[in-house]
Amino acid sequence: MKVLIIQDQMLTKGGSEKVFTYIAVCFPYAELFTLSYNKDTSLAFSRSDDLNTSPIFNMLIRKHSAFKFFFPLLTYYFQFKNFKHYDLIITSSATVAKYIRKFDGKHICYCYVPTRAIWEVDNYFPKKTFIKKVFNIFLPWLKSRDLKTTN
Protein backbone atom coordinates (compact mmCIF):
# COMPACT_ATOMS: atom_id res chain seq x y z
CA MET A 1 0.00 0.00 0.00
CA LYS A 2 1.41 3.37 -1.03
CA VAL A 3 0.78 5.96 1.71
CA LEU A 4 1.38 9.71 1.73
CA ILE A 5 1.12 11.99 4.76
CA ILE A 6 0.73 15.71 4.08
CA GLN A 7 1.09 18.72 6.36
CA ASP A 8 0.23 22.23 5.14
CA GLN A 9 3.58 23.67 6.18
CA MET A 10 6.26 23.02 8.78
CA LEU A 11 7.26 26.54 9.77
CA THR A 12 6.15 26.74 13.40
CA LYS A 13 5.94 24.60 16.52
CA GLY A 14 2.16 24.44 16.57
CA GLY A 15 -0.43 21.79 17.25
CA SER A 16 -0.96 20.63 13.67
CA GLU A 17 2.78 20.17 13.27
CA LYS A 18 2.83 17.98 16.39
CA VAL A 19 -0.04 15.86 15.07
CA PHE A 20 1.78 15.47 11.74
CA THR A 21 4.93 14.21 13.49
CA TYR A 22 2.90 11.67 15.48
CA ILE A 23 1.14 10.41 12.35
CA ALA A 24 4.51 10.14 10.57
CA VAL A 25 5.83 7.91 13.37
CA CYS A 26 2.73 5.68 13.15
CA PHE A 27 3.29 5.16 9.42
CA PRO A 28 7.07 4.66 9.15
CA TYR A 29 6.98 3.65 5.47
CA ALA A 30 4.74 6.50 4.32
CA GLU A 31 6.06 9.31 2.17
CA LEU A 32 5.94 12.71 3.85
CA PHE A 33 5.12 15.99 2.14
CA THR A 34 4.73 19.63 3.09
CA LEU A 35 4.75 22.82 1.08
CA SER A 36 7.55 24.39 3.08
CA TYR A 37 9.85 23.33 5.91
CA ASN A 38 12.13 25.47 8.02
CA LYS A 39 14.13 23.33 10.43
CA ASP A 40 15.14 26.40 12.45
CA THR A 41 11.58 27.44 13.34
CA SER A 42 9.66 24.16 13.23
CA LEU A 43 9.55 21.04 15.34
CA ALA A 44 12.44 18.65 15.18
CA PHE A 45 11.23 15.11 14.59
CA SER A 46 12.72 11.73 13.82
CA ARG A 47 11.65 11.63 10.17
CA SER A 48 12.58 15.17 9.13
CA ASP A 49 15.10 13.80 6.62
CA ASP A 50 12.24 11.99 4.85
CA LEU A 51 10.22 15.18 4.44
CA ASN A 52 9.62 16.23 0.82
CA THR A 53 8.70 19.81 -0.02
CA SER A 54 7.56 21.81 -3.00
CA PRO A 55 10.82 23.33 -4.29
CA ILE A 56 9.17 26.56 -5.42
CA PHE A 57 7.14 27.15 -2.28
CA ASN A 58 9.93 25.99 -0.01
CA MET A 59 12.07 28.73 -1.53
CA LEU A 60 9.34 31.41 -1.35
CA ILE A 61 7.85 30.53 2.01
CA ARG A 62 10.43 30.44 4.79
CA LYS A 63 8.32 32.28 7.37
CA HIS A 64 4.74 31.91 8.46
CA SER A 65 4.05 35.51 7.39
CA ALA A 66 4.90 34.57 3.78
CA PHE A 67 2.54 31.59 4.01
CA LYS A 68 -0.26 34.03 4.81
CA PHE A 69 0.55 36.05 1.70
CA PHE A 70 0.40 33.02 -0.62
CA PHE A 71 -2.61 31.38 1.06
CA PRO A 72 -5.18 31.83 -1.78
CA LEU A 73 -2.70 30.47 -4.33
CA LEU A 74 -1.70 27.55 -2.12
CA THR A 75 -5.25 26.21 -2.02
CA TYR A 76 -4.90 25.52 -5.74
CA TYR A 77 -1.57 23.74 -5.41
CA PHE A 78 -3.20 20.74 -3.75
CA GLN A 79 -6.21 20.83 -6.04
CA PHE A 80 -4.06 20.50 -9.15
CA LYS A 81 -1.29 18.24 -7.85
CA ASN A 82 -1.71 14.66 -9.03
CA PHE A 83 -1.91 12.12 -6.20
CA LYS A 84 -3.44 9.24 -8.18
CA HIS A 85 -0.56 6.82 -7.53
CA TYR A 86 -1.30 6.69 -3.76
CA ASP A 87 -3.64 4.22 -2.09
CA LEU A 88 -4.02 6.31 1.06
CA ILE A 89 -3.39 9.98 1.78
CA ILE A 90 -3.54 11.33 5.31
CA THR A 91 -3.61 15.11 5.59
CA SER A 92 -3.03 17.16 8.70
CA SER A 93 -4.59 20.40 7.56
CA ALA A 94 -5.28 23.71 9.21
CA THR A 95 -5.35 25.55 5.90
CA VAL A 96 -4.62 24.13 2.44
CA ALA A 97 -3.79 20.39 2.36
CA LYS A 98 -7.48 19.50 2.72
CA TYR A 99 -8.05 20.83 -0.81
CA ILE A 100 -6.47 17.80 -2.51
CA ARG A 101 -8.18 16.64 -5.67
CA LYS A 102 -10.25 13.49 -5.48
CA PHE A 103 -8.38 10.35 -6.48
CA ASP A 104 -9.12 6.61 -6.51
CA GLY A 105 -7.58 5.92 -3.09
CA LYS A 106 -8.74 6.89 0.38
CA HIS A 107 -8.24 10.33 1.92
CA ILE A 108 -8.27 10.78 5.68
CA CYS A 109 -8.10 14.41 6.75
CA TYR A 110 -7.34 15.51 10.29
CA CYS A 111 -8.87 18.89 9.63
CA TYR A 112 -8.51 21.79 12.03
CA VAL A 113 -11.57 23.91 11.42
CA PRO A 114 -12.39 26.65 11.13
CA THR A 115 -9.49 27.85 9.01
CA ARG A 116 -8.43 30.91 10.99
CA ALA A 117 -7.10 32.71 7.92
CA ILE A 118 -10.62 32.72 6.48
CA TRP A 119 -12.93 32.85 9.48
CA GLU A 120 -10.88 35.00 11.89
CA VAL A 121 -9.30 37.43 9.46
CA ASP A 122 -8.75 40.18 12.04
CA ASN A 123 -6.77 37.82 14.26
CA TYR A 124 -4.82 36.36 11.34
CA PHE A 125 -4.03 39.75 9.79
CA PRO A 126 -4.12 42.09 12.82
CA LYS A 127 -2.92 45.22 10.99
CA LYS A 128 -4.50 47.05 8.09
CA THR A 129 -1.96 45.99 5.52
CA PHE A 130 -2.01 45.71 1.77
CA ILE A 131 -2.04 41.91 2.10
CA LYS A 132 -5.15 42.06 4.28
CA LYS A 133 -6.93 44.33 1.79
CA VAL A 134 -6.16 41.98 -1.09
CA PHE A 135 -7.11 38.96 1.01
CA ASN A 136 -10.49 40.54 1.84
CA ILE A 137 -11.29 40.72 -1.87
CA PHE A 138 -11.04 36.92 -2.09
CA LEU A 139 -12.66 36.28 1.30
CA PRO A 140 -16.27 35.49 0.22
CA TRP A 141 -14.99 33.04 -2.39
CA LEU A 142 -12.52 31.46 0.07
CA LYS A 143 -15.23 31.02 2.72
CA SER A 144 -17.56 29.36 0.23
CA ARG A 145 -14.82 27.05 -0.97
CA ASP A 146 -13.75 26.20 2.58
CA LEU A 147 -17.30 25.22 3.56
CA LYS A 148 -17.66 23.05 0.47
CA THR A 149 -14.34 21.30 1.09
CA THR A 150 -14.87 20.56 4.77
CA ASN A 151 -18.39 19.19 4.36
Task: Annotate the PLM regions.
Residues M1-K13, L35-S36:
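Nucleotide-activated donor-dependent transferases that construct or modify glycoconjugates
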Residues V3, Y29-A30, H107:
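Hydrophobic anchor at the start of a short beta-strand
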Residues T12-K13, D40-S42, A97-R101, R116-W119:
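Short catalytic/ligand-binding loop motif for oxyanion handling, primarily in non-cytosolic enzymes
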Residues S16-C26:
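Short amphipathic alpha-helix
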Residues A24-F27, F83-K84, Y99-D104, T150:
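Short, conserved loop/helix-junction motifs that constitute active-site signature segments
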Residues Y29-K98:
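Active-site donor-binding segments of glycosyltransferases and PAPS-dependent sulfotransferases
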Residues L88-T91, R101-T129:
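Active-site proximal beta-strand in glycosyltransferases
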Residues K127, K132-N151:
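Membrane-proximal helix-turn-helix segments that form the acceptor-binding/catalytic region
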